[in-house]
């Protein structure tokens, strides 16, 4: 395996992500227990801390909510945990603003307003997540009103500074986030079950591959190759694919007759783009002895127009007539006008030399038909 010189060798493979470790869960449970004890001590004590008592209690209840989310649903820490963390930071900022004066107080107020806007935006984002999970407009409206109701009750608790009211407000905030957590857990699980992949159905890629194989088999059934070669070991005189769609050559990588394709190696070395061909015609080879008719897709060999009899040593003249008597069904038929078997194609060929004599030095022309 080649290593990237700039990045260095790869490091050790990371273990797959699994459920949280028992040690992390135990630590979270311990922190949750401590937070509950501190919260109960603040709420139930006779300490007259004023508004700071309400803020400390609210900060502890937010920490408790974050720990509950971490223990039961860590995947929901991003929307719910971030909202609780942002509310906790705003609460600590308010505690700090209680003892600030002058320019620091104004700067703290600006940060407080900015934090409130972030909380509002994050709450709207959370409602959008609930909407995507299938929440109705009435459920979203209920969560929205409950959130603002808790905010109003928190402001009232700051004004009243009563322990029982503070306890009530904190419990309402806890119930709000627990309700959202339970709703997201239930509907998120149902949403994933509804969109679960059914193994009994074929995979989309598998279905595409099957249809592709069927189309290839259908096209191969209707494809017929015609190969006309000269006698002896000479170069072939003509090759044509009659069954390709549209009447043109096909670009398949492997054909039975090795004609009319762009494969790198063909036994007959005709009608392909190989670099070296014995006849050096109809190819894109860089070096050709005759330097004629190169770089063309299908160019015939030079022919002398002055020789009307065709005795210029070129290939024999080929004349073909294709008739499709069966519509689009079956292989295309070829006829020489003389009848014959209607199920087999025939070919009308000219001769080279002296107009059809048997003393042709190249011998008779051979016809091979492949299904």
Curated annotation (Swiss-Prot):
Q: Name one GO cellular component term.
A: membrane
UniProt motif (Interaction with host TRAF proteins) ranges: 204-208
Q: Which GO terms describe its biological process?
A: symbiont-mediated activation of host NF-kappaB cascade; symbiont-mediated suppression of host JAK-STAT cascade via inhibition of host TYK2 activity; symbiont-mediated suppression of host TRAF-mediated signal transduction; symbiont-mediated suppression of host type I interferon-mediated signaling pathway; symbiont-mediated transformation of host cell
So which stretches are on the Extracellular side? Answer: 45-51, 97-106, 161-163
What family is reported? Belongs to the herpesviridae LMP-1 family.
Region CTAR1: which residues? 194-232
Q: Where is this region: CTAR2?
A: 337-371
Q: Which Pfam families match?
A: Herpes_LMP1 (PF05297)
Give the protein name, as stated in the record.
Answer: Latent membrane protein 1
Annotated region (Disordered) at: 194-371
**Compositional bias segments (type: Low complexity):** 251-292, 342-351
PTM details? Answer: Ubiquitinated on the N-terminus.
What keywords appear on the UniProt entry? Activation of host NF-kappa-B by virus, Host cell membrane, Host membrane, Host-virus interaction, Inhibition of host innate immune response by virus, Inhibition of host interferon signaling pathway by virus, Inhibition of host RLR pathway by virus, Inhibition of host TRAFs by virus, Inhibition of host TYK2 by virus, Interferon antiviral system evasion, Membrane, Oncogene, Phosphoprotein, Transmembrane, Transmembrane helix, Ubl conjugation, Viral immunoevasion
> InterPro entries recorded for this chain?
Herpes_LMP1
The entry describes its oligomerization and partners as:
Interacts (via PXQXT motif) with host tumor necrosis factor receptor-associated factor (TRAF) proteins TRAF1, TRAF2, TRAF3 and TRAF5. Interacts with human protein ZMYND11; leading to negatively regulate NF-kappa-B activation. Interacts with host UBE2I; this interaction induces the sumoylation of various cellular proteins. Interacts with host IRF7. Interacts with host TYK2.
Biased-composition ranges for Basic and acidic residues?
A: 210-224
- List the Cytoplasmic topological domains: 1-23, 73-75, 128-139, 185-371
Q: What does this protein do?
A: Acts as a CD40 functional homolog to prevent apoptosis of infected B-lymphocytes and drive their proliferation. Functions as a constitutively active tumor necrosis factor receptor that induces the activation of several signaling pathways, including those of the NF-kappa-B family. LMP1 signaling leads to up-regulation of antiapoptotic proteins and provide growth signals in latently infected cells. Interacts with host UBE2I and subsequently affects the sumoylation state of several cellular proteins.
